[in-house]
A protein has these predicted regions:
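Mature, function-bearing regions of proteins
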Residues: 2-425
Length: 425
C-alpha cells in the first residue's frame, strides 16, 4: 500500500480541525457562567441572603467576561435614554456640556466613574471580587483601604448637586442601568443573564442608589422594573430639547464609523431605541427593512458568540484596578489612564518608542487625525477621580469629595489617593 493512501487528505484534516475547534468552544464557552453559578449555588434558593460583595462578584461574569461590550454599551445607552425625558433634557441642554467638542469627555467621564465603583471593592462583609483579587492579591485589609469606589461615587454626587435633578429622575436612571443590560443581553448576547445575575445587579445597584441618597427604591427588582415602566410611559414625551440631544448623540456615535456607513448606522441606532424613545426624541420612523437588518444582525451576533468564539482569556474593563505606582515627586499626584477610548483620546498617555514613530508616520501620510493623538488638551497625564467632570470644575470640590468619600468608608482617604484640595465649594 502506498504512503499516499495511508495519510488523511487535506479536506479531512481541515474538517477535523474545524470540528475540534467547535468542540473546544462548546466545552469552554460557559466556563465563567458555570463557575459563578457553582460558587453561589447556595444563594440561588435564597436570593435575600445575597451580600453586596457577592452581588458585585456575580455581576462581573457578564460585565467583564461573557458579554462586556453589550453590558458597557447598554449602560451608556441607559444614560442616553434619560435624554428622552423633557425634564432631564432641559437640564442637559442648559449645561452646554453636550457640545461636539465636549460630549466625548462626558462619555468617558461617565464610563470611568461607573466602571470604578462597579469593580473596586466596598467596605463590607466578605472578600472582594475575584477580578479585584486577581489584580491585587487576597489581602482583605488592603482591599478595605482602597477608596476608589467611594471617591467615584462622592465625585458623582458632587457633580449632580449642581443640577436640579429630581429623585424620580435618579430612580428611573438607576432602573435603566440595572435592566437595560439584561434586555440587551437577551437581544444581542450569546447568552442571557440568569435570575441570579439579575438579582445581583439589583442588590449591587440598590446599594449605589442608597449611596447617591436616592429615596423610595423598591425592595425587589420586579417592583422597580414595574415602577420604571409606568414612570417612563407617563414622562417620556416629545420635546425639542430631547431632539437636540438625540441629534448630538447620533452625530457623536456615527463619528466612530466610516463615513460611507454613517447613514445606515444612524438608522440602526434609532431602531435600537424602540418606538417610545424614538417618538419622544422626535426622530423619523425607520423602514421595516432596517428593523429586519437589525434583527438579522443580532441573530448572527448571538449565533457567532455562542458557537464560534471561545471565551475571553482576560477580563475587559474600562479602568484598571491594579495597584497604582507611588508618584515620583511630592508635587506629582498619582494619575490613572483608562483602558478604553472614545471618539477623542481623553486621559490616554502619549505613545513612546516605535509606537511614537509609527504615529508620526501615520499623521504625515494623512492616515490619522491630529485629534486622535493624546495631547495636553486631552489631559494626557491621566485622571484623578476627584477631578472628573466638566473642565471648568476640574480644580474644585476636591476636599469635599475626599470628605464625603471618607464618611462613606468610615475612615479618611489615605495614601496615594489623598490629595489636598485647591477649593471647597
Amino acid at each position: 500500500m502506498s504512503p499516499s493512501n495511508t495519510l488523511p487528505s487535506l479536506p479531512s484534516i481541515g474538517a477535523i480541525a474545524v470540528l475540534s475547534y467547535l468542540l473546544f468552544v462548546r466545552l469552554t464557552r460557559w466556563r465563567v457562567y458555570n463557575h459563578v453559578h457553582r460558587k453561589y449555588a447556595h444563594r440561588i434558593a435564597d436570593f435575600d441572603t445575597l451580600t453586596l460583595a457577592e452581588a458585585q462578584d456575580i455581576t462581573h461574569a457578564a460585565m467583564l467576561w461573557d458579554v462586556p461590550s453589550i453590558v458597557m454599551n447598554s449602560m451608556s445607552f441607559a444614560i442616553v435614554r434619560t435624554y428622552a425625558f423633557p425634564a432631564m433634557s432641559r437640564i442637559l441642554c442648559g449645561t452646554k456640556e453636550l457640545q461636539p467638542d465636549t460630549v466625548s469627555r462626558r462619555y468617558i467621564d461617565t464610563a470611568i466613574l461607573v466602571a470604578t465603583y462597579s469593580v473596586c471593592p466596598f467596605r463590607t462583609k466578605g472578600p472582594p471580587s475575584e477580578f479585584y483579587v486577581a489584580a491585587n492579591g487576597t489581602d482583605e485589609d488592603a482591599a478595605a483601604a482602597d477608596p476608589r469606589a467611594y471617591l467615584a461615587i462622592a465625585r458623582m454626587n458632587w457633580l449632580h448637586e449642581h443640577y436640579p435633578i429630581k429623585n424620580d429622575d435618579f430612580l428611573v436612571t438607576l432602573a435603566f442601568l440595572i435592566f437595560l443590560p439584561v434586555r440587551w443581553a437577551e437581544r444581542f448576547g450569546w447568552r442571557t443573564l440568569s435570575p441570579l445575575e439579575v438579582h445581583a445587579r439589583f442588590v449591587f445597584w440598590k446599594h449605589i442608589g442608597e449611596l447617591m441618597h436616592i429615596r423610595d427604591i423598591p425592595d425587589s427588582a420586579v417592583e422597580l422594573e414595574v415602577w420604571a415602566e409606568e414612570y417612563e410611559a407617563r414622562h417620556m414625551t416629545p420635546a425639542d430639547t430631547n431632539h437636540i440631544l438625540a441629534e448630538g448623540m447620533l452625530t457623536e456615535l456615527a463619528s466612530s464609523v466610516p463615513s460611507f456607513a454613517r447613514g445606515l448606522f444612524r438608522r440602526l441606532v434609532i431602531c435600537v431605541m424602540g418606538e417610545r424613545m424614538r417618538i419622544a426624541m422626535k426622530l423619523p420612523v425607520q423602514p421595516p427593512a432596517v428593523h429586519a437588518l437589525l434583527d438579522i444582525g443580532a441573530a448572527l451576533v448571538r449565533f457567532a458568540g455562542r458557537h464560534l468564539f471561545p471565551p475571553r482569556l482576560h477580563a475587559y474593563c474600562a479602568v484598571s484596578v491594579k495597584p497604582v505606582p507611588i508618584p515620583k515627586g511630592d508635587n506629582e499626584p498619582t494619575r490613572m489612564h483608562p483602558l478604553m477610548k472614545v471618539t477623542k483620546p481623553w486621559y490616554l498617555p502619549r505613545t513612546t518608542g516605535m509606537w511614537r514613530v509609527l504615529e508620526k508616520l501615520m499623521l504625515a501620510l494623512g492616515l490619522r487625525s491630529i485629534d486622535d493623538v493624546p495631547a495636553p488638551k486631552y489631559d494626557d497625564k491621566g485622571y484623578r477621580l476627584e477631578e472628573i467632570g466638566p473642565v471648568r470644575w476640574k480644580t474644585v470640590g476636591h476636599a469635599l469629595v475626599m470628605q464625603k468619600a471618607g464618611e462613606m468608608m468610615g475612615c479618611p482617604v489615605q495614601g496615594v489617593w489623598a490629595q489636598p484640595s485647591t477649593k471647597i465649594t
